[in-house]
A protein has these predicted regions:
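Active-site-adjacent beta->alpha loops and helix N-cap segments on the catalytic face
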Residues: 1-19, 29-36, 59-65, 85-95, ...
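Glycine/Thr-rich beta-alpha phosphate-binding loop at enzyme active sites
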Residues: 1-2, 43-103
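Catalytic cores of alpha/beta
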Residues: 30-44, 97-101, 112-129
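Glycine-rich phosphate-binding active-site loops on the catalytic face of alpha/beta enzymes
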Residues: 49-59, 111-112, 118-145
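Extended, intrinsically disordered, low-complexity segments
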Residues: 87, 95, 148-174
Length: 174
């Protein structure tokens, strides 16, 4: 996650005889200053895009809910945090990156467990989404549910191409 180390790594990768498309995956724990530096680096090195965000170690700003299975508060749990608790933080980071470079391919991940969460990520600026934890808890039905939900929103807003929704800030309508 260190922009200086990342620059050195990318120089080595770019020197390979064949370089596949590259996406940099960032953590939600980065400061906006570090994110800005990484965005500049991505433009300088012609990287294909960013995957935002993955597992977090930080518990600040998260809902401090009781976890039934362990009996502890979310803020007291150890290890990497993923899924729904990252949703708002991930949306904020996606919006920040999208405002820096509206042409950068952003893959949104972290807390996408419903059609509404997917729509929020897209309207925050993600042009693609990934699901992990949501898939584990909701199963394979999550994907068609997300697709149907997005289609309903596009119809509601009379949008013919999902690209028009990317970064639009449009809210979820029931």
């Amino acid at each position: 996650q260190d922009p200086i180390l990342l620059r050195e790594l990318l120089k080595e990768i770019k020197n390979l005889p064949e370089c596949p498309p590259l996406f940099i995956k960032i953590a939600p724990d980065l400061s906006f200053k570090d994110i800005d530096e990484i965005c500049q680096l991505i433009n300088d090195e012609e990287i294909n895009g960013i995957i935002a965000t993955n597992t977090s170690l930080d518990r600040l700003g998260l809902e401090n809910t009781l976890i039934e299975k362990t009996g502890t508060l979310l803020s007291e749990e150890s290890g990497g945090l993923s899924g729904k608790p990252l949703r708002n933080k991930a949306n904020k980071i996606i919006r920040h990156i999208h405002n820096i470079d509206k042409n950068l391919t952003l893959i949104g991940v972290g807390g996408i467990d419903s059609p509404e969460a997917a729509w929020e990520r897209i309207t925050s600026g993600a042009s693609l989404i990934q699901v992990y934890t949501g898939w584990i808890y909701k199963g394979p039905r999550l994907v068609p549910d997300i697709l149907q939900g997005i289609l309903k929103q596009l119809n509601y807003y009379q949008i013919s191409n999902i690209k028009e929704a990317v970064g639009s800030g449009l809210s979820w309508k029931n």
